[in-house]
């Protein structure tokens, strides 16, 4: 292991304690009936054989750990390499959806973990993977066409310009409108707080993509899975660079970036992320009132439902 176990354990414990304090300070640890205060067991995978629980967050090392959980379920590496079936579909054949009650019981006898990522880096990754590089004839390709028709000037007249792919700025206009109108968000950019309700569950390990190699090495060690799965990150080469962050977020105004902060506010605050490196690359708003309005904006987060139709696009 690249660092001694004690140092890694201390870092992970600090994250866990930080999350508990933040949950309490934000009032998110109090059970209720809305999506932020009600346990959401929908995206959890529970390995009863290995006593391991994972809340799958799309665009946060999800491909790697979906592969790992399929290995734990008994699929061979050779089968997983050759099959045309979607990894999530395979996983759900072995790991049924949990109820609140069954997941609570599993937490009492398992090691539970969550992998998080900077909210705006995750958002950009979702855009690049599912919109910019959408597969032909896919739901995301259809969504991209709809975004262009709505947000690109003259597109309705057949003038798409140089690109038939939505720009990041066009995608963000779509996302902001979705939230303002209370529409369903795609799972690849739904806030983690909505997905995994981390204040409602006592996760043992909160891994960050920034330190993923060490975090998952420690996780595999704690779960006793050395020799069963490997601490790999399958899409690490596709990670978002600082240059890409500047390239894409410089298309947005600072008011828009602040609006995004409000959408992902709890992901920022619960997992100790900031706007450093994002807000400063945004375009200065011509109207100071727009920036002031964004700063004073009430939280935009609304109830998001889960859309199974997107489950084929992991």
Regions found by a protein language model. Give the residues of each.
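Membrane-interface amphipathic segments in extracytoplasmic regions
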Residues: 1-314
């Amino acid at each position: 292991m690249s660092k001694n176990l004690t140092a890694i354990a201390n870092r992970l414990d600090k994250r866990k304690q930080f999350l508990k304090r933040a949950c309490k300070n934000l009032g998110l640890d109090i059970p209720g009936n809305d999506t932020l205060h009600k346990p959401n067991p929908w995206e959890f995978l529970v390995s009863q054989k290995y006593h391991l629980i994972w809340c799958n967050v799309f665009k946060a090392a999800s491909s790697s750990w979906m592969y790992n959980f399929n290995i734990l379920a008994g699929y061979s590496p050779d089968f997983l390499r050759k099959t045309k079936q979607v990894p999530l579909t395979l996983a759900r054949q072995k790991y049924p959806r949990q109820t609140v009650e069954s997941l609570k019981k599993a937490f009492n006898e398992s090691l539970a973990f969550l992998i998080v990522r900077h909210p705006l880096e995750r958002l950009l990754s979702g855009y690049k993977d599912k919109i910019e590089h959408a597969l032909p004839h896919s739901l995301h390709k259809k969504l991209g066409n709809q975004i262009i028709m709505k947000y690109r000037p003259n597109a309705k007249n057949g003038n798409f310009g140089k690109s038939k792919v939505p720009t990041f700025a066009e995608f963000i206009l779509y996302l902001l409108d979705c939230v303002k109108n209370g529409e369903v968000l795609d799972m690849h950019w739904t806030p983690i707080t909505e997905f995994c309700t981390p204040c409602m569950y006592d996760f043992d390990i909160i891994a960050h993509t920034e330190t993923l190699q060490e975090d998952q090495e420690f996780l595999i060690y704690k779960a006793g899975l050395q020799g069963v799965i490997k601490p790999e990150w399958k899409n690490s080469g596709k990670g978002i660079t600082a240059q890409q962050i500047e390239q894409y977020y410089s298309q947005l105004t600072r008011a828009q970036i602040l609006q995004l902060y409000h959408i992902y506010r709890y992901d920022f605050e619960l997992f100790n992320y900031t706007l450093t490196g994002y807000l400063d690359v945004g375009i200065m708003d011509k109207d100071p009132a727009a920036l002031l309005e964004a700063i004073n904006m009430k939280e935009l987060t609304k109830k998001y439902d889960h859309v199974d139709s997107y489950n084929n696009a992991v």
